[in-house]
Every structure is written in C-alpha cells, then in structure tokens.
C-alpha cells in the first residue's frame, strides 16, 4: 500500500501568513469533535504586548500545551525562532493517539520537520488515518502534494467559502 492509497481524504490548507489557516482548522475541529475520533495538534502563536514571540503546540485530545519555538539564539532554529526539541514528543504523541479517524496536523512546515520523528509520524498518519486536515506552509506544498494532499489556497476573501467546503468534504454541517 502506498501513502496515497490509504487516506480517503487528505486536505491541506495553505496561504500567506495571517489569512486564518489555524483559525479555520480550529473551527472545523470544534464541529468535528462530535463525529470523529480525532488525533493531532494545533500550533498557536504566543504574543507578548501584541508582538509574536513564538509558538506553542496543543494536543487536540488532551489539551496539553507546550512551548515549541521562541525568539532567541540557539539551535535548531528556523528564522528568529529556536525550536524546543522537547516538545517534539508531544507532537509525536498527539499524532499517534488512537483511535483516530480524523488527524489534525497544524502545520506541515520547517519547524515541525526539525523534530527527529516528524517525517515518520506524518507518514504513519497518512498511511493509517482515513481523513487528514492539515495546514501547509507555502514552501512545503510540494511535499504535501507528494504525500497525496489536495491543497487549497486560503485567502481572506475565500475563507468562509473554504471553511464551508472543508466541512462539506468531511460530511459535517454547521
């Protein structure tokens, strides 16, 4: 079985920063919780005085939250953010949670690929989960497509339409 054969639905949401990719996935998650066994994680911005200083990871099942990246100097890093490799275990645990028939992956991007097991965990989710909703950093669309994702480009103008389309594709209604 190839990666493309298993998942019934692999939707990736990509777009420029600030268009609402994580917001869309979070809103879909709220509706989907009553219908699906969900696994995965959400990445949220951390702000101080209105300025983004980093990102936290939240396990969508347990609600456990850990710091993932902060401004600073150190390794590994992506741009101005230093990655907390200790949080990679939370990402792995969140993706491997069973049972799972809808995986939330927010996001597939450079920071997540700094985690030693992220590629393996992502491949396992793609192979073993019938539905996946992911946010895709715009520089990683090619990788997502190779994994069989259908990628939707999100803008502020098409946000509401895309949200409704994703719900419909998952068999959900609001």
From Swiss-Prot:
Q: Which residues bind ATP?
A: 15-22, 102-109
**What GO terms are given for molecular function?**
ATP binding; ribonucleoside triphosphate phosphatase activity
EC class of this enzyme? hydrolase
Name the catalysed reactions: a ribonucleoside 5'-triphosphate + H2O = a ribonucleoside 5'-diphosphate + phosphate + H(+)
Which residues belong to the signal peptide in this entry?
Answer: none
Alphabetized Gene3D superfamilies for the sequence: P-loop containing nucleotide triphosphate hydrolases (3.40.50.300)
Q: Domain of life of the organism in this record?
A: Archaea
State which Enzyme Commission number(s) the record gives: 3.6.1.15
- What does it do? Has nucleotide phosphatase activity towards ATP, GTP, CTP, TTP and UTP. May hydrolyze nucleoside diphosphates with lower efficiency.
Q: Which NCBIfam families match?
A: PRK13695.1
Official protein name in the record: Nucleoside-triphosphatase THEP1
Q: Which organism is it from?
A: Pyrobaculum islandicum (strain DSM 4184 / JCM 9189 / GEO3)
């Amino acid at each position: 079985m190839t990666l493309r054969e298993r998942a019934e639905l692999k939707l990736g949401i990509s777009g420029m920063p600030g268009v609402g990719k994580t917001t869309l996935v979070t809103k879909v998650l709220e509706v989907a919780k009553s219908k699906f066994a969900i696994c995965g994680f959400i990445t949220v911005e951390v702000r101080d005085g209105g300025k983004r200083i980093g990102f936290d990871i939240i396990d969508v099942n347990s609600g456990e939250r850990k710091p993932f990246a902060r401004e600073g100097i150190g390794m590994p890093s992506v741009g101005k953010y230093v990655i907390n490799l200790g949080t990679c275990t939370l990402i792995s645990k969140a993706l491997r949670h069973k049972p799972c028939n809808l995986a939330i992956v927010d996001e597939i991007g450079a920071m997540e690929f700094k985690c030693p097991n992220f590629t393996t965990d992502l491949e396992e989710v793609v192979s073993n989960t019938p539905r996946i909703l992911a946010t895709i950093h715009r520089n990683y669309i090619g990788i997502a497509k190779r994994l069989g994702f259908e990628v939707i480009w999100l803008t502020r103008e098409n946000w509401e339409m895309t949200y409704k389309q994703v719900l419909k594709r998952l068999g959900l209604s609001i």
